[in-house]
C-alpha cells in the first residue's frame, strides 16, 4: 500500500489487488456499507503512518475508485467530532451477491463526483493530435496525416438501453482487450467509448471488432465530445476491464 497527501484535508491511499487479497477483501466489498469494510479501513489506518493532522481528526469520509490493477481510496477529514462515516461508500442495503443494479448504483454514488481526475490519456492524445492537424496543416497534408493517425487508432461510441445490456456486453467480451474505455450515463441511456490500437493488426480488424461490439451494444447517437460535456461520467478510464473483472451474481 502507498499513501500520498493531496491536500490538508485529503489523502490518497493506493491499495494493490495483492493487498486486498492479503486482507481477505474483494472489489465488491467496497460497494456496500458493512462491518467488514469498516474493519478494513481501521486496519489500513493502523498500518499506515497517517499525517498528524489526520490523527484524531474527527469524522473521516472515504471514497473508493477501482483501477485496473489497484483500488484508490480517497480519505477526507472534516472538523466534525464524529466517528468514521462510511456512508460515502454507498447508501445501498445489504445484499447477498453483487447484482448489476447495485454495482451501477455504487458507481453513480461514488464515482461521478470523484476528485482524482486523470485524463484518459490515449483518447485525449488522439483528439489533441487531430486538432493540431486541423489548425496547422494544409488540406492535402491534413488528409494524409489524419489517415495515418486513424491507421494507428480508432474509437467507437456504443449505446446501451439498460445496465443489464452493459453487463452482457462485458461478459461477452471477456477475452477482448482495448486500449482505452470510458463509461457514461445520459438520461436513461448508458454509453461506452472504446479505443482500439490498430497498428499491429490486419486491415479487417477494426471492422471485425466493431461488428463484434454491435452483437451486444447499439450504435450510439451521441459523440464522445457531446458525452464529455453533457453526460455523467461513471468511469473515466479502464471501464471495460473493470466491468469484465467484476463477478456478477
Curated annotation (Swiss-Prot):
Superkingdom of the source species: Bacteria
Signal peptide coordinates: none
A GO MF label: protein-macromolecule adaptor activity
Stated role: Enables the recognition and targeting of unfolded and aggregated proteins to the ClpC protease or to other proteins involved in proteolysis.
Subunit record text: Homodimer.
Family, similarity comment: Belongs to the MecA family.
Domain notes: The N-terminal domain probably binds unfolded/aggregated proteins; the C-terminal domain interacts with ClpC.
NCBIfam families named in the record: PRK02315.1-4
HAMAP family reported for this sequence: MecA (MF_01124)
UniProt protein name: Adapter protein MecA
Species in which this protein is naturally found: Streptococcus thermophilus (strain ATCC BAA-491 / LMD-9)
Gene it is expressed from: mecA
